[in-house]
Amino acid sequence: MKNLFLLIMLACFTFSVNAQDDKATDNFSKWQARFRVISVMPSAGDDIDGADVDISTAYVPELDFTYFFNKNVAVELILATTKHDVDLDIDGGGTADLGHVWLLPPTLNLQYHFYADDFKPYVGAGINYTLFYGVDEGDVVDMDYENSLGFSLQAGVDYNLNDKWFLNLDIKQLFLSTDVDVDTGEGVLPVEVDINPLIIGLGVGMKF
């Protein structure tokens, strides 16, 4: 998946060199909104010896708003919330149920858009602040997740259906981690968990 993300970013830069469309860039809207269905696929890592944290994939709707400073440079605010089941896979066999947690990760990306006829690829990078809420503790006494600041990379493409509506394919990689305190009933275990989700979305957008 990460190789696919890098290939799309490379393709976007190729478009910028070989396929800039002056006519397209003369007609742009200051605001865009997209509605996507996204797949959020965590790539979990932790600092626990003898066990690995497993975080489930989530499929949810997502809404974003984009404002263009000029024909190429824009800023995008991404809004979505996801629920993930959390397990602890113990080396040698066995799994501990750590319940579930909801993530609210508003993300702000600075984007650069290219133009190639009806195709408009783009790349972006920005910041993310993830809020953890709605925690279910599963088999342990308590789970406490610390809200965290992270970073994001993005690549995607819009395809114009007409002057107002367009289709969108978007891939984002978020780099985020959280400190978790796990109360087992016999003591509190501090754990640093890397979540680092890959997010793939497909949807429709509107210019206004």
Would you name each region that the model predicts?
Residues 5, 17-39, 43-46, 112:
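Outer-membrane beta-barrel biogenesis signature
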Residues 10-17:
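Hydrophobic h-region of N-terminal signal peptides that target proteins for export
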Residues 106-108, 125-129, 146-157, 171-173:
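Hydrophobic alpha-helical segments of small multi-pass membrane proteins
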Residues 84-89, 162-208:
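Predominantly the C-terminal beta-signal and adjacent terminal strand-loop region
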Residues 44-51, 86-95, 133-142, 179-187:
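Outer-membrane beta-barrel translocator domains and adjoining extracellular loop/strand segments
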Residues 32-41, 64-137, 159, 195-208:
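Gram-negative (and chloroplast) outer-membrane scaffold detector with strong preference
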Residues 36-64:
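Long, hydrophobic/aromatic N-terminal blocks
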